[in-house]
Amino acid sequence: VVKKFGRSSKLLALLLSLTLVFVAGCQAIANVDFNTVLNKALKVTSTEGKQSIELKMLFDEQAFVGLPEEEMALMKLVSSLKLQLDNVKVQDSSNLSLNGSLIFGDATSIKFSLKMSDTLAVMELEGAKQPFVLDLTSESLLGLTGIPVFPVADEETAAKPALDEASMTALGHQIVDTVGAYAINNLPNPERIQVKPAIEPINGISTSLTHVHIDLDGPEIWTWLKKYVDALVADRAGLDKMVAGVFEILAGNPELWAAMGTVNPFTEGELDAPTPEEMVKEASDAIAVMLTELQAELKLVETEDKETLDEVLSKDLTIKADVYIDNKLDIRKQVYELSYVPSANPELAVLPLKGLTVKVESEAWNVNGAVKAEVPVATESAIHAEQLFTMQGYKILKQFDEKSTIYDLLKNKLHIGKQSVSWFTDDEYNPPIVTPVGVTIIPLRDTAEQLGAVITYDKKTKGIKVFDEATNTTIVVKIGSDKAVVNGKTVKWSFPVTVVDGAAYVPARNIASALGAKISWTEFYEDVKIFKIEREV
């Protein structure tokens, strides 16, 4: 089942993205040059518009019988999702701004706005007490990933030429044109396609457009894919020309390699280095072999796994595409809808779904015109994204109004305030210990810090102090004593604080009670058990 799920999910993931290719790769119909349409679409640098993505899932409720009520409610919540983006302004590849909303079902929604430049992104969320900012400089982004940032080694490296945005864009356009001559021109027409004139509102203005409509089902997609691969394999001359063209572009722009800090493979000098002609032939041969292997793999699927193929790419899988093109061959409006009914065969079913629909819509105006996006500004009160990565769930909740929709979603639906700490009985470092009198003791520092509490040691009083911000609880204990002071009140615990291998251990049930948590034991395997302390704050 896992193997089939992997194959099925990969096929499904390609379907929607292929639809535009179906449209753009067609041979000219009704005097519309679709190859030019795609090339222009790939070269759009500025635009205004609006977009939406909608997902609807019809679950088989029988598959969820016995699930907790909270999980059922969450499944229903995500069964209908819509991301709506309005007032989208794309100034260039680095600067944009938009307003949007994430809609759950028919009523629940969270509004937001986003402003981005080449160095900064600022998002405001409805219900948030302050905006969230993300530093987009390379050093900051590397820091988020945990990759160390090293200083520039020498002046030579620091002086490395950088390609400006205009140069990179021009290079990209050249490569699109070169690759498109082979990859796009070999695209076959889908079987069902219609082209007719239409008048559609774009930004509220009635606009004369050419309407391209395509219908596809699973078997038609498979037929189209085989025809496309066959055409690519047959056009060896086109492949050779494409590869030679790409290599010519790369060889003619040595500053690209310098900007990347990579050795230019086209630089002459080494005696045994391959010639440019040899490199082109080697690359072209490798792609040709890959395409031939793909062609054989498609045939193999038809013979050895036809049942899965017929179930996944069945007539119950449909794609409808409506693309509206103006007289400049710019795409102004797009509507794509994918519908899928999973297999009724339990061995082939990948999810407990009765049906799935994905709908994508967009409108565009002022295409490649003068567009000015709103400029992001980081205020002093803004929360930086890197802070969120280290925040406990309860601290994240404090960034939102308790009466807001997003607070309710995070706390009561997604339960980000849930915390748990687990130990295996065979852990080599600070395992849970069951004492001879039957009391379970656990390491105090590990417990406190993983729950977000702060632990300190007072050398003068020799007291260990734990402050738990989530519950506003203060606990003071001493080594060797079974007395604890919880929020100023002295209580007796079931076992004295004990040092084991340098770590202070405390009775689990007592510390859990003081911190508003519960404890539990579960079997893992053979003689190994898992001890867990958990709470929701």
Language-model features: locations:
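C-terminal motif of bacterial Sec signal peptides marking the signal peptidase cleavage site
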Residues: F22-G25
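Long, intrinsically disordered, low-complexity Ser/Thr/Pro-rich regulatory/activation regions
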Residues: N487-V499
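Subset-of-secretome marker
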Residues: Q27-V439, L444-E449, A453-V476, V497-T498, ...
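Bacterial N-terminal signal peptides that target proteins for export
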Residues: V2-L12
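Sec-dependent N-terminal signal peptides
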Residues: L12-L18
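Extracytoplasmic/periplasmic beta-strand context in beta-sandwich domains
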Residues: E526-V528
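A low-complexity, Ser/Thr/Gly/Pro-enriched, surface-exposed linker/loop concept
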Residues: N472-N487
